[in-house]
A protein has these predicted regions:
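Short, well-formed alpha-helical segments that are part of the catalytic scaffolds
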Residues: 1-18, 201-214
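Acidic donor-binding segment of Leloir-type glycosyltransferases
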Residues: 23-46, 209-214
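Short phosphate-binding loop-to-helix
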Residues: 39-73
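Structured catalytic core of nucleotide-sugar glycosyltransferases
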Residues: 54, 88, 93-95, 188-214
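Short aromatic-hydrophobic micro-motifs that form the base-stacking/packing surface
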Residues: 75-77
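Conserved donor-nucleotide/metal-binding helix-loop-beta segment in metal-dependent transferases, i.e.
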Residues: 84-108
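Short, glycine-/small-residue-rich phosphate/pyrophosphate-handling segment
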Residues: 120-141
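Conserved alpha/beta core of the MobA/IspD/sugar-nucleotide pyrophosphorylase nucleotidyltransferase superfamily
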Residues: 137-189
Length: 214
């Protein structure tokens, strides 16, 4: 179920990128998963295996790879941000027209988006990824290198059951979430509970259990 949900995240994110004029690159791990990703996301994207010993190095190398292909700017996003929208991506590129680095913060103290015009590898190095200080530490590293910073809106990455429950709650108010691949999947997997009042009906309960759990 977790894998299917993450596939929905990827579909939604790729769909939003396709609404922008940007070329799309997918950096994946482990090696050997390219064919599955192509089936999921399409052949029009470009796929590269991730390189590096840790998350920071892999992200830095991905940005360096894309900029090395001759692009003026690169925006890197996480793969667990189903509420990411094309407008946010377009804003990130606009920010890079006047700033060296753009960051998109998450509610838990991390970031879901980072973009730059040159591969500033020091921004990625030595960070405790997965902790609540990543955004602050990355911001400090960029400033220490004398880089100017801009920002996009804060979003929630899907790291826990409470994050998913928050997404479900927002689905009630936002039609675009209900229509997304993630929203449709969550709508099909809503947990239900049934309360059956009984009194001294052991045999009835046993028969009911047999029907529910054959």
């Amino acid at each position: 179920e977790c894998a299917r949900l993450h596939c929905c995240f990827l579909k939604d994110i790729a769909g939003e990128f396709r609404k922008t004029p940007a070329d799309i690159f997918v950096f994946f791990t482990p090696e050997g998963k390219k064919e599955r990703l192509v089936r999921l996301l399409g052949e029009d994207l470009r796929y590269f295996a991730q390189e590096g010993k840790d998350l920071g190095e892999r992200m830095g190398n991905a940005v360096k790879k894309v900029l090395g292909l001759g692009y003026d700017a690169c925006v890197l996003t996480g793969s667990d941000i189903p509420e990411l929208r094309a407008e946010t991506l377009k804003l990130a590129f606009r920010v890079l027209e006047c700033k060296d680095v753009v960051l998109g913060p998450t509610a838990d103290g991390g970031y879901y988006l980072i973009g730059m015009k040159r591969p500033h590898m020091g921004v990625f190095e030595g960070k405790a990824y997965g902790t609540g200080s990543v955004f602050q530490d990355t911001e400090a590293a960029a400033k220490q290198e004398g880089l100017s910073l801009g920002y996009t809106e804060m979003l929630t990455d899907m790291d826990s059951v409470s994050d998913l429950n928050g997404y479900r709650a927002r689905m009630k108010e936002r039609e675009e979430l209900r229509r997304s691949a993630t929203g449709r999947y969550l709508a099909r997997t809503v947990p239900i509970s049934v309360i059956i009042p009984v009194y001294n009906e052991a045999e009835t309960i046993e028969r009911l259990q047999e029907q529910l759990f054959p």
